[in-house]
Structures are given as structure tokens and as C-alpha cells.
Amino acid sequence: MTVKKADVLLVGGGVMSTTLGTMLMQLDPSLNIVMVERLDHVAHESTYGWNNAGTGHAGYCELNYTPETGDGDIEITRALAINASFEVSLQFWSYLVERGGLPSPDEFINTCPHESFVWGESDIAFLRKRHQLLSAHHLFKDMEFSDDPRTLQDWMPLVMEHRDPMQKVAATRVRYGSDVDFGSLTRNMVEHLQKNANFELLLSHPVKSLKQTSDGRWNVQLSDSRNGGSKTIDAGFVFLGAGGGALPLLQKSGIAEGDGYGGFPVSGQWLVCKKPDIVKRHYAKVYGKAAIGAPPMSVPHLDTRIINGEPALLFGPYAGFTTKFLKTGSSFDLFGSIRANNFGPIMSVGINNMDLTRYLIKEAMQSHSDRVKSLLNYFPEAKEDDWTLAEAGQRVQIIKRDAQGRGKLEFGTELVASKDGTLAALLGASPGASVAVKAMVDVIERCFKDRLSSADWTAKLKEMIPSYGESLVDNAELLHSVRSRTLSVLGLDKKRL
């Protein structure tokens, strides 16, 4: 059996692993890095263009990031944090573009206004107050608000055409929002990594087992599903960035920090339109409010998508119930993840979230006509024949123990790392890929503390991410500086012709 030594083993060929590998190779090109992917291509699960919405999540249009509190206030803390995190991604991508590590920005990111759209007096009041609170902060100072139908006709013509003129509507807009093809971004970063002789990519190599040895390193067994046989990687550090597949791998590792975690898988579907005469009439990501009782991941939105240079429209998502952790996974994934240490939390979440489960099952059983009826709220003239149904990627929400030992369901991402810093796993979903760079900086800070204490690594991180070590939420001058640069380098300051 072949045994290969590696300083770093990246499990999963998606945006998370690729971002970490790219950052580490910039910090120390002599590192021996191996990436393993169970499929025969990188970026084919959640990172693949049509498996996600491609929204550069910045909190501009996503109303679920600014929830109303019990006393009628609006909490904006999460929106500020997500916006600042996305600015970190933009800085790193700009750095790579400037140094040839990424191609022309329009191959992976395009300007696409981010807009929120609501109707009815109560939701309009909410949106107006949200705008007042957010636009008072430097991160959101360019956000516009309007309840004038003529202005909205200019912002989102497809949404406003043939709408009831008596219906009260309102919207906000940030002109320099973005549509990101995370598949293209990831493939290009992998191609650049492959130019370094110290990087190796192993496709069609799923992980069968991983075990820590007495010297603190990791013995990782791989199977070669293309040619047969197996390989062993002897790794100093392992990152589990396998999307929904990260939880089962974390469980295989046996680290104590992974005890109690479970996964709640949610499937997704989109309505897609590629008819040029319709696509050309909409150029924005228009987000609404989730229906009462709907989970946060089901916020409806009508989006411009540009994947492999081809424009299209997307509407959804339509969530559904599933037991798979990956789109290409097994229906037994959920059941296979149940352990003695997470059985209680999983059962607790199941019992306490029966309404959510019923909602997901109901969503999955909708007809095409039912789905198009939802679309009519955002495109009054939509015709069934113009739209087709597409399967999105899987999202595995986090189940974890609360302070009372019961289970709670979390809609976010979380980094789980071993005490000795030799293994880390990223669990969860939204906002996901948009904050990949910030998430991988967290991995470096937790698992490469000794190296990060050196002046060389700190200086290099500062070069890659000029805001590193400082708060974009608190520092308006710094935000203005980095945003001006990234909008220019990535071409996000250009108005659409």
C-alpha cells in the first residue's frame, strides 16, 4: 500500500478546501499539500454553479439576517458581521487577481444589484426601518430605499411589470452587489495550485478512515474508486471541507470536540429560465421575506445568474425533506450519522421541529404549477412553460447540544477543531461560500498558531487581506479604503451597459 507524507491534507475539492490550500501556499510555498476529492471533478457538489444561488452574501438584500425582535426592534449585528466577512473574501480575490492567481474577474464574479422587495404596510414599515438602521452604518451607507413604483420599475422591471397599481410596494438596493460563480472561482484556484510542485490533487479518492497516531499525525486511508486499490496519507494537519460530508468524516476522526454534533439535511430546488427575451429584462438579485412558518433558508429570491458566461434567471429555493448529506450521497447518510453521543440532540431537534419537517415535506410535494404560483409574487407575468425545475445542492444544518444537554438547530456555519490543532472541520451552510476566506482565516488562527506568531506569516496575511487584524465594522476609514480597491480590481464599480 502506498503511503504518502503531507504537511496538509485537504478533504473535499470545494471552495472551502481550495481557499485554505491557496492561502497556505501563499503563506509558505514549501508546504506539501494534498487535496482529495471523492468525485471525478473538483467543485461538483455544493460549490458547483447551479447547486447554489451564487449570491455574494453581504447582508444587503437578505432580510433574514436582520430579524425583528420581540419588542419591534430590528437586530442588525449579524448583517454587519456578514458584510464585513464578505469584504474579506473580496480582498483576497482581489489580491489573487492582481498576482495572476485568478483570471479576469468577470470569469467568476459580476456586478449584480442586491435588492430587497416587499409589499403590504407592515413589511414596508419593516423595510423602511431596516434601511434607516443599516444605512446609518458605514458598511451600508450606499443602500437606497424607495416606495415609488416608477423607481422600482427602473430597478426591477420584470418584478413590476403588470403588477396591481394599487398594491403598496417598497424596495432597497445596493448597486454594487455581486453574482459569484463559485464553481469557476474554485476551479481556477485549483488550477493555480497545481502549478506548484508541492501540491497534489487526487480525484475519485474518497476517505475510508482517519486515525490519529501516537506522534500526533493522521493516518488517512483512501480508496481509488477509478482504478481500484487504496492509498494512505500520513498528514500533519487535516481539514475536512467536504460540505455535507464533513460531519461523517468528523465522526470517523474520533476527536472529542466532535461529540454531540448532528446534521439536519435539507434539499433544494430552483425554477430556472434561460429564454433570452426574458433573461435580458431582469438584472438583479431580488430577495423577499420568508413566508410565516418557513425556515430561514427558504427566503424567496429572483436572481440573475451568470454561470460559465451564460446568463439565466433563477427563482427559489424550494426546500425539501431529505436524508442525504450530499447531492451525490446516500439516503442512509442521516441514519448512518447517529451515534450514542448525538442521539439525544438529534431526537430533541426532531421532536421540537415537527412543523419544520412537515413544511419541508409539503414543499417537496408541490407541483410545477404550485411553484410557479409562488414565482408570480415576483414576476406577475411568469408562464409555466418558460421555467424548468433544477436540483440544488444539499444543505446540512447543524444540530448541537445546548447548555441543558438538549439539541438545538442552527442555521449557520461552525468550525470544529481538535484541541491540538491537527484537525479541523467546517460544518453547516449559509452564508457558506461567501465567507470562505474569513472562515479559513479562522482555521489558520486556530490550527497554525505557532506559524502565525512569526512576523512573516502575519505580514503576508496583511498583504493578502489588508484589513487583517482590524475591524471593518468599527473602522469606517479602513472600510472605505479596502472597498474602493476591491470594487475597482474586481470590476464591481462598473455600471451595466
From Swiss-Prot:
Enzyme Commission number, as recorded: 1.1.5.4
Required cofactor(s): FAD
Keyword NADP belongs to the record: no
GO terms (BP aspect): tricarboxylic acid cycle
Pathway: Carbohydrate metabolism; tricarboxylic acid cycle; oxaloacetate from (S)-malate (quinone route): step 1/1
Key words, A-Z: FAD, Flavoprotein, Oxidoreductase, Tricarboxylic acid cycle
Reaction equation(s) it catalyzes: (S)-malate + a quinone = a quinol + oxaloacetate
Enzyme class: oxidoreductase
Family matches, as Gene3D superfamilies: D-Amino Acid Oxidase, subunit A, domain 2 (3.30.9.10), FAD/NAD(P)-binding domain (3.50.50.60)
Family: Belongs to the MQO family.
Record NCBIfam families: mal_quin_oxido (TIGR01320), PRK05257.1-1 (NF003603), PRK05257.1-4 (NF003605), PRK05257.2-1 (NF003606), PRK05257.2-4 (NF003608), PRK05257.3-2 (NF003611), PRK05257.3-4 (NF003613), PRK13339.1 (NF009875)
Listed name of the protein: Probable malate:quinone oxidoreductase
Lineage per the UniProt record: Bacteria, Pseudomonadati, Pseudomonadota, Gammaproteobacteria, Oceanospirillales
Gene name per UniProt: mqo
